UniProtKB/Swiss-Prot annotation:
Gene source species: Mus musculus (Mouse)
Protein name: Beta-1,3-galactosyltransferase 2
GO molecular function terms attached to this record: N-acetyl-beta-D-glucosaminide beta-(1,3)-galactosyltransferase activity
Biased composition regions of type Polar residues, renumbered to the chain: 95-110
Keyword Coiled coil found: no
Catalytic activity: an N-acetyl-beta-D-glucosaminyl derivative + UDP-alpha-D-galactose = a beta-D-galactosyl-(1->3)-N-acetyl-beta-D-glucosaminyl derivative + UDP + H(+); a beta-D-GlcNAc-(1->3)-beta-D-Gal-(1->4)-beta-D-Glc-(1<->1)-Cer(d18:1(4E)) + UDP-alpha-D-galactose = a beta-D-Gal-(1->3)-beta-D-GlcNAc-(1->3)-beta-D-Gal-(1->4)-beta-D-Glc-(1<->1')-Cer(d18:1(4E)) + UDP + H(+); a neolactoside IV(3)-beta-GlcNAc-nLc4Cer(d18:1(4E)) + UDP-alpha-D-galactose = a neolactoside IV(3)-beta-[Gal-beta-(1->3)-GlcNAc]-nLc4Cer(d18:1(4E)) + UDP + H(+)
Chain segments annotated as transmembrane: 21-43
Membrane-related topology note: Single-pass type II membrane protein
Lumenal topology ranges: 44-422
UniProt xrefs under InterPro entries: B3GT2_N, Glyco_trans_31
Main localization category: Golgi
Role this protein plays: Beta-1,3-galactosyltransferase that transfers galactose from UDP-galactose to substrates with a terminal beta-N-acetylglucosamine (beta-GlcNAc) residue. Can also utilize substrates with a terminal galactose residue, albeit with lower efficiency. Involved in the biosynthesis of the carbohydrate moieties of glycolipids and glycoproteins.
């Protein structure tokens, strides 16, 4: 027992006596206590110390206590909040930085808390300031994209750095900028930094950017928990470089989008552009998921309310161009949440803008719709497509789009006869 105490308890044998005591005089004792108390206060009031990670690293600029009612159809009537507004910040484009300097090492970063901590390390190592403000530097930017043409529609496509095949498939299909004759479309892929920080991958992305000029990338970690940052990057880019664009769609890289139906049946270029317009698949009355094992887990510390405001599924929503700047600016005074579509809904509630339902509730789908040319000629989004599937079904729809439902009926009858014969 004595050996264990010597190895693991004390580095040197000490005997205690009044002669050795730090408190052998009243004055020394008082000074020692004052010093210890001062050190305690110093360490207790600094959140940047190592070993103290947590939600304090997440940008927090308000205390939220609202959105408790699910009866109201409006997005703001049940808004009961205590806001702590931050000083207005102007939209300032950041100069692109050299990607060769991106030498962080967030290997294996997963989960909400680790992502927030890694974001903080990027700020510290890059010297970009405190994460309470949105100041991520551009690695790749396209500031002159809207100077060459005046787009009617901008497609903001959230993509992972390694999804090269998905980006190629989108360029060949629904993201083709020449898809609608007489209608200017701009396609922009939104990227962060790959968790693996593969130098070859970053070089390939830069080559891809030089060829297509449709990638914008900033130096935040590209994770699920940073989708809100990615979307705000797109909003800020539109507000800064394409402020007069009538409409914007934000969607994901695994989506099927019927761009022609979106333009001609929903947005209708012949009509005057709408303002404060936001639509998609409406999510009403949803409660925060408190299951810590869930992908959609929302900690009570971040969002204590019992209900989310009305929001649109992040798989695909459409909004008027004037909202890009409004959403980005109001976000600077709102606590950042990792659920991007919920967060955008909160921004809209603060702006007192109600998302409106689309003409048909099956136009926007955040699930995969079984394919038929008839169904896909009358929808805008369908989810979970591999690049090869996207090309296959897109080509089939283009071949049959003028008689989509008639051809679909013929194909169905042909399959029925084939099964009957065999």
């Amino acid at each position: 027992m004595l050996q264990w105490r010597r190895r693991h308890c004390c580095f040197a044998k000490m005997t205690w006596s009044p002669k050795r005591s730090l408190l052998r005089t009243p004055l020394t004792g008082v000074l020692s206590l004052v010093f210890l108390f001062a050190m305690f206060l110093f360490f207790n009031h600094h959140d940047w110390l190592p070993g103290r990670p947590g939600f304090k690293e997440n940008p927090v600029t308000y205390t939220f206590r609202g959105f408790r009612s699910t009866k109201s159809e409006t997005n703001h009537s049940s808004l009961r909040t205590i806001w702590k507004e931050v000083a207005p910040q102007t939209l300032r484009p950041h100069t692109a930085s050299n990607s060769s300097n991106t030498e962080l090492s967030p290997q294996g970063v997963t989960g909400l808390q680790n992502t927030l901590s890694a974001n903080g390390s990027i700020y510290n190592e890059k010297g970009t300031g405190h994460p309470n403000s949105y100041h991520f530097k551009y690695i790749i930017n396209e500031p002159e994209k809207c100077q060459e043409k005046s787009p009617f529609l901008i497609l903001l496509i959230a993509a992972e750095p390694g999804q090269i095949e998905a980006r190629r498939a989108i360029r060949q299909t629904w993201g083709n900028e020449t898809l609608a004759p007489g209608i200017q479309i701009i396609r922009v892929f939104l990227l962060g930094i790959s968790i693996k920080l593969n130098g070859y991958l970053q070089h390939a992305i830069q080559e891809e950017s030089r060829q297509y000029h449709d990638i914008i990338q900033q130096e935040y970690l590209d994770t699920y928990y940073n989708l809100t940052i990615k979307t705000l990057m797109g909003m800020n880019w539109v507000a800064t470089y394409c402020p007069h664009t009538p409409y914007v769609m934000k969607t994901d890289s695994d989506m099927f989008v019927n761009t022609e139906y979106l333009i001609h049946k929903l947005l209708k270029p012949d009509l005057p552009p709408r303002h404060n317009y936001f639509t998609g698949y409406l999510m009403r009355g949803y409660a925060p998921n408190r299951n810590k094992d869930s992908k959609w887990y929302m900690p009570p510390d971040l969002y204590p309310s019992e209900r989310y405001p009305v929001f649109c599924s992040g798989t695909g929503y459409v909004f008027s161009g004037d909202l890009a700047e409004k959403i980005f600016k109001v976000s600077l005074g709102i606590r950042r949440l990792h659920l991007e579509d919920v967060y955008v809904g909160i921004c809209l509630a603060k702006l007192r803008v109600d998302p409106v339902p689309p003409p048909n509730e099956f136009v926007f789908n955040h699930w995969r719709v079984s394919y038929s040319s008839c169904k896909y000629s009358h929808l805008i989004t369908s989810h979970q497509f591999q690049p090869s599937e996207l090309i296959k079904y897109w080509n089939h729809l283009q071949q049959n789009k003028h008689n989509a439902c008639a051809n679909a009926a013929k194909e169905k009858a042909g399959r029925y006869r084939h099964r009957k014969l065999h």
